[in-house]
Amino acid sequence: MARGSVSDEEMMELREAFAKVDTDGNGYISCNELNDLFKAACLPLPGYRVREITENLMATGDLDQDGKISFDEFIKVFHGLKSTEVAKTFRKAINKKEGICAIGGTSEQSSVGTQHSYSEEEKYAFVNWINKALENDPDCRHVIPMNPNTDDLFNAVGDGIVLCKMINLSVPDTIDERTINKKKLTPFTIQENLNLALNSASAIGCHVVNIGAEDLKEGKPYLVLGLLWQVIKIGLFADIELSRNEALIALLREGESLEDLMKLSPEELLLRWANYHLENAGCTKITNFSTDIKDSKAYYHLLEQVAPKGDEEGIPAVVIDMSGLREKDDIQRAECMLQQAERLGCRQFVTATDVVRGNPKLNLAFIANLFNKYPALHKPENQDIDWGALEGETREERTFRNWMNSLGVNPRVNHLYSDLSDALVIFQLYEKIKVPVDWNRVNKPPYPKLGGNMKKLENCNYAVDLGKNQAKFSLVGIAGQDLNEGNRTLTLALVWQLMRRYTLNILEDIGGGQKVNDDIIVNWVNTTLKEAQKSSSIASFKDPKISTSLPVLDLIDAIQPGSINYDLLKTENLDDEEKLNNAKYAISMARKIGARVYALPEDLVEVNPKMVMTVFACLMGKGMKRV
């Protein structure tokens, strides 16, 4: 199993698992460390069985016969043994290792009796982050501050308020505050808040397919932590993007184009940022945020490089005390380093133990937070750079990208065009709309250096072929090369048809397979409005009346009577700001009554017919379920 075919998320999990077994931190797993792992996990296994499993793992994993398992060999063990009894026991042992709490699974997805594990370290880190983020929010006083050493977090998310607030901190204005139920909560109003949180999380690109409101109400730890990590990460990564932070151009390497830099994921940009500063400090580069930072030395030098030097008005210098580097003990050294980070206001996400164990998820968050506060980069002057190429993504592009990510495509889509250039994500979307993909025809990464693009082009040709012949899409004038080269107009034409089909499929499933088109949706909307004695109606998805959002709001009130507070709305002679105000309320209310709406308020104000169609289709789905 090559590293290239393992997703970033999975690589993170594997590094975490590896770090738990590799107790001496030398980068290898020995036979003794495997024995210790099974002892520490207290699994009900006889001694001879532990010996057998250990020998089996060493025999399978130690490919170069050097008496120890490297990280690359460890990846192969995990993938090669996925279904065997040995692997199951091995995974169970890792999950039960210190700092990991194992709990019985009870959700519909997991039959009772299976084990779901969650990380105490993550819980501790997230609680401290949320406490700080919401410490001054009057709506959260009933739960903040939470105690990181108890299960406060899992109870605190149960009413949906904290989740809604954290989503808005990560992507401001996602949720209209007027739609959050805050006072005298009942089981029904709590359910509404949780609908609002889950559907809004989905709209910002969180994968929430297996999470229900009930899971959050019950505070299921592994689901709560999984959702919170996605929300927090989206917020941390928001500005690690060239169009939003032009100073990142300072990270361009010799012979590299702006386009190359724009293709990097936030994780890759963070690694490059750290190495840029380490290089300036004359230090060794790092290749990851786990094993390479365990001794805290890279962190020390990074802090020294980014700390304010006193050369900017109003920002006093902070001189990093490097004496802790001389500490012999790793934990002690990490603690001294974190005390210096605290002087910068950046002691977040990691404890000294998390650093020494190389917890990849929490160290990534620590670095991202440090970058956001002290990037210490300067936009290069006089460089021959096409600043015009730096335009950010359009709202429509962002909506498509968030939709894909919310469905759990792998790898995650950070840049719509470059991340679709091998069509792997497109194939996954075909499967979501019930178009069968012959995976034997698909080339998978890692692609060879020579001829790699040809492999991607073959994928793109197959993707266009599937669209034309299986999905029956209208793809006139679109060739595989257009997807491969990231032609905006033609890529969007395919992506829109994928999203449209996905939306209509949901309606057809609810309606027992009955075919649905635009006219059927418009007729349903008007009939529903009329039956509820509402005065509004729409002629099509281009109807100018939609810019007031009143037809949408009336439809929501028709589906769930009494849900809309009309006192909050302006209904006549609206200016642009009032239209936007209505639209924000409408989109959040649609999500609150249970419609998974991806469109943005601006789509209603500008009457973007594509996105307007998805709003009405999602509401129709909700309305049909009610019948």
From Swiss-Prot:
**Positions of Ca(2+) 1 binding:** D22, D24, N26, Y28, E33
**Protein name per its UniProtKB record:** Plastin-2
Single GO molecular function? identical protein binding
Query: Which PANTHER family does the UniProt entry name for this protein?
Result: FIMBRIN/PLASTIN, PLASTIN-2
- Ranges for domain EF-hand come to 9-44, 49-84
The record describes its post-translational modification as: Phosphorylated on a serine residue in response to costimulation through TCR/CD3 and CD2 or CD28. Serine phosphorylation promotes association with the actin cytoskeleton and targeting to peripheral cell projections.
Give compartment(s). Answer: Cytoplasm, Cytoskeleton; Cell projection; Cell junction; Cell projection, Ruffle membrane
Per UniProt, the keywords (alphabetical) are: Acetylation, Actin-binding, Calcium, Cell junction, Cell membrane, Cell projection, Cytoplasm, Cytoskeleton, Membrane, Metal-binding, Phosphoprotein, Repeat
Primary role: Actin-binding protein. Plays a role in the activation of T-cells in response to costimulation through TCR/CD3 and CD2 or CD28. Modulates the cell surface expression of IL2RA/CD25 and CD69.
Where does this protein come from, organism-wise? Answer: Mus musculus
List the GO cellular component terms. actin cytoskeleton; actin filament; cytoplasm; cytosol; filopodium; focal adhesion; glial cell projection; perinuclear region of cytoplasm
Set out the biological process GO terms recorded for this chain's protein.
actin filament bundle assembly; animal organ regeneration; cell migration; extracellular matrix disassembly; positive regulation of podosome assembly; protein kinase A signaling; regulation of intracellular protein transport; response to wounding
Question: Where in this protein does the record say Phosphotyrosine is found?
Answer: Y28, Y124
Matching entries from Pfam families are given as: CH, EF-hand_7
Phylogenetic placement of the source organism: Eukaryota, Metazoa, Chordata, Craniata, Vertebrata
